[in-house]
Amino acid sequence: VVWTNEERSIISSIFSNLDYDDIGPKALCRCLIVYPWTQRHFTTFGNLYTPEAIMTNSKVAEHGVKVLHGLDRAVKNMDNIKATYYDLSILHSEKLHVDPDNFKLLSDCLTIVVAAKMGSGFTPETQAAFQKFLAVVVSALGKQYH
């Protein structure tokens, strides 16, 4: 993947201004509520039976924050995202057996949450760079499935 200086700047700016404790849980909650079949990968998280239960589940919140910190690793290694996620890809494919399509669903939910937070600052150019970044991450996480 080739990144322009503008794309690098946009991605860095987005992540440097995100409140991980707010955005991460919101994105994961949205994914688990909108796509309930994704809940099967979180059976150890306890009660996920209702949207309210999901939104107040501390394990969901903690994992949402963890996901954003994982994305931060990609921001810091934009020229080598696939290698950065090699071990994580193996974990998700071979141990956790996560359907790789779920990464795309979560990235879509994250895009919605970030867009809502940024408001008019989430321009088409910003969205294009953000979605390109997430597409590379999703591809890297799914690499071991191929």
Swiss-Prot record:
GO cellular component, as recorded: blood microparticle; haptoglobin-hemoglobin complex; hemoglobin complex
Cited InterPro entries: Globin, Globin-like_sf, Globin/Proto, Hemoglobin_b, Hemoglobin_oxygen_transport
Tissues showing expression: Red blood cells.
SUPFAM superfamilies (UniProt xref): Globin-like (SSF46458)
Domain Globin: 2-146
GO molecular function: haptoglobin binding; heme binding; metal ion binding; organic acid binding; oxygen binding; oxygen carrier activity; peroxidase activity
Gene Ontology terms: biological process: hydrogen peroxide catabolic process; oxygen transport
Matching PANTHER family: HEMOGLOBIN FAMILY MEMBER (PTHR11442), HEMOGLOBIN SUBUNIT EPSILON (PTHR11442:SF7)
Subunit-level organization: Hb1 is a heterotetramer of two alpha chains and two beta-1 chains.
Protein's name in the database: Hemoglobin subunit beta-1
Organism, scientific name: Pseudaphritis urvillii (Congolli)
